[in-house]
């Protein structure tokens, strides 16, 4: 760990010590460099930074919250500090990071998972916290479950549809909210029976191993709800090995717009796909750039906002996103989204439609 900390410190010196741009931003990416979602998330941020003239640095924590905290400590208490720190409240690390940031001179912005009510009460109002942008995770889980049920053939009165669910981590806000949305949809459809919900840790191999065991116990399952694409593919592999045909014998759902997930929608192997939240970091940079130029974010939708980014992606849109995917910025002109000089009625167009122009 000491070697890792020394390496991070050297990196900070190289990055921020020579910074000549008006604003420097460090993003603490909680994910892995092997995860398609978090890589695409970073790529979209980098595209935004280039267009906006922001000096952006990204550090990955490789799914280790203790590494996120170590990175934050060096950024906030070291000699070369960024102007802004963007981070995720993954595994509820935000209060610790905010304590480190006290009197550091670094401004904070939270993405993807904001402060919980209890955390907000704990840290109170802070002038250094600029704002937050989070997706509609609860609604996303609900929409995905509703779409699966809609696509499933109707059953006779008294018969049931059997479901397996793969959630992420118990201590991840996005996982909890998507799960909550799924349960809300199930309450509206008593004919669907949730056989078991397991935590796949967002990982394909773990979901595969879990699905193999669950299939023996519940051979009549015909719906699989998964909180991300990796777990959906792991479960799909287990069902395929058992002789089940994805999209016919069993309907699968997932979240994330990885190329593999988009292709699975086009091929019919994934029946319901939600995505769009990989853009949150890029949108956050638009707001930070506006803030740097004196824009009052409260006048343009508020500083803490939930954005309805998670939307159902059909075959047409999946193919369109695949065709556009070679360009990580999706052709977005980030500067044109600025609220500077616009009337108070203006709202940032942070949605999938902005990518589908």
Residue ranges and their predicted role:
Residues 67-83, 92, 208-220:
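Short, well-structured alpha-helical segments in soluble
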Residues 36-52, 140-147, 173-192, 210, ...:
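Short, solvent-exposed amphipathic alpha-helices that sit
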Residues 68, 131-161, 207, 257, ...:
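Hydrophobic alpha-helical segments within soluble ligand-binding/sensing domains
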Residues 166-170, 283-357:
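Hinge/cleft segment of the Venus flytrap/periplasmic-binding protein
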Residues 24-44, 48, 57-71, 89-92, ...:
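Extracytoplasmic "Venus flytrap"
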Residues 99-139, 261-262:
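Flexible loop/hinge segments that line or gate small-molecule binding clefts
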């Amino acid at each position: 760990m000491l070697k890792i900390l020394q390496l991070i410190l050297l990196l900070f010196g190289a990055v921020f010590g020579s910074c000549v741009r008006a604003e420097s931003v460090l993003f603490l990416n909680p994910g892995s460099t092997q995860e398609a979602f978090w890589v695409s998330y970073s790529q979209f941020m980098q595209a935004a930074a280039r267009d906006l003239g922001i000096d952006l640095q990204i550090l990955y924590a490789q799914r280790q919250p203790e590494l996120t905290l170590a990175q934050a400590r060096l950024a906030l208490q070291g000699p070369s500090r960024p102007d802004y720190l963007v981070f995720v409240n993954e595994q509820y690390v935000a209060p610790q990071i905010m304590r480190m940031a006290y009197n550091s001179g670094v401004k904070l912005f939270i993405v993807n998972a904001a402060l919980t009510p209890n955390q907000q009460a704990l840290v109170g109002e802070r002038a250094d916290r600029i704002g937050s942008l989070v997706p509609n995770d609860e609604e996303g889980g609900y929409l995905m479950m509703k779409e699966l049920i809609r696509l499933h053939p109707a059953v006779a009165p008294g018969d049931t549809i059997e479901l397996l669910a793969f959630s992420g981590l118990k201590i991840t806000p996005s996982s909890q909210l998507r799960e909550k949305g799924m349960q809300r949809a199930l309450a509206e459809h008593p004919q669907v029976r949730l056989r078991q919900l397991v935590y796949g840790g967002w990982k394909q191999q773990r979901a595969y191993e879990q699905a193999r065991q669950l299939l023996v116990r519940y051979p009549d399952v015909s719906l699989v709800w998964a909180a991300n694409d990796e777990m959906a593919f792991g479960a799909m592999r287990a069902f395929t090995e058992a002789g089940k045909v994805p999209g016919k014998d069993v309907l699968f759902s997932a979240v994330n717009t990885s190329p593999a997930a988009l292709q699975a929608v086009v091929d019919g192997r994934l029946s319901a796909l939600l995505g769009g939240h990989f853009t949150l970091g890029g949108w956050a940079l638009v707001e930070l750039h506006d803030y740097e130029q004196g824009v009052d974010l409260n006048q343009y939708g508020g500083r803490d906002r939930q954005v309805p980014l998670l939307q159902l992606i059909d075959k047409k849109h999946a193919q369109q996103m695949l065709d556009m995917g070679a360009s990580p910025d999706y052709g977005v002109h980030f500067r044109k989204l600025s609220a500077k000089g616009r009337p108070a009625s203006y709202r940032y167009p942070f949605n999938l439609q902005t990518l589908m122009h």
